[in-house]
Amino acid sequence: WKTWTGCVLGIAGAGGIESGMAVGMQNTGSAEATENDDLPEIAESGDERLSTLSGKIRVLLMDSGYQSYYHSSVTLNLNGADYEYTPDSPELSQGELVLGGGEAGITITSIERQESPPVYYGTLEIQNTPQGLLLINELPLETYLEGVVPSEMPASYEGQALMAQAVCARTYAVCQMEEGSLQEEYGADVDDSVNFQVYGNIAPTDKTSQAVRETSGQIMCQDGKPVTAYYFSTSSGRTSTDEIWGGTSSSYLKSVECEFDQNAPWSSWKVTIPWTVLEERTRNLTGSESLESIQVVKKSESGAVTGLQITTEKEAVQLEGEYEIREFLSPQGQTITEKDGSTVTGGSLLPSSYFQLKANKGGCVEITGGGFGHGVGMSQTAANEMAKEGYSWQEILEYFFRDITLDRYE
């Protein structure tokens, strides 16, 4: 990839920004089915698609519900014709089928998303493996981003907030393409879930696509390298650094005060979890029958809980890391009351790791907290409020990140 330095975000020598804050392969060609074709034409492919310099990204598509990378079958519509593939399909006898969708894209009807059925542009690779079918969508990075922005931020948000989101998403994607964590095992750069960035869950709108186009190629770098541009929904009043995941925090991620989203429903919340629920989780975790106590034993500099001690009749076990703690304290099926008094049913994770708890053995655990998401990087709700107050997308990024430059990815 190539970059050139545009503007510097932050003030060198003045402590930087008060910050804290979510490659492609060679073109394999495009194949389109015609009315006279029994099957869609297969795009040429080869080892050259493993290049990381083409400006294309390879996305591993998960199944409905985002439970697995493997599909038992795939049904799709290409140029008005319907096709179905299974591991026994003759077209997959060589192990791989590559389809090109053209301008209309490929509609995969066997995958359910929030807005179904999803449409994918570029090429679709169907790989036959012993575990099932792998689906990899290879497409231009900018086209990919048009599927990420509306899936990660409401299209109703202000234009400048959407543009800041587009730059974060682009930077994050380029960073993942360089790291290649899925390349060796799956031949992909990212998947389409919250494991990386949600892609293709909600269809693009003119407004979200415009945000991508108006920031075309812009990424955030430090020392000439793309940063990992994390983002999340709503802060508790302060952002975190990536130290909440262990290790030393990155220099471009600093904890900052964040009052822009202080009136958001998720800025504070409370939930009660029955003691018996946590006792069952403790039993699954440790094998012990009795849960004696739960207490916070460690917090990050920003106030996020990073250590939770669970004491049983046999031992004391400490959970470390915000994700593990939020998972153990999952309010699944419980009622969460938000700041404005509205209620929602809890999911598989505690809304955030910014919380306090009051444990009553044999009764319940009362948890009061603030924020939604991991808290690292840019608060999307705050970004929208900043945009309403007249902040530009560059100024929004300046607030959440430190000592970075805006460079252009090509």
Predicted regions: what is each one?
Residues 1-410:
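Conserved, single-site charged/polar hotspot
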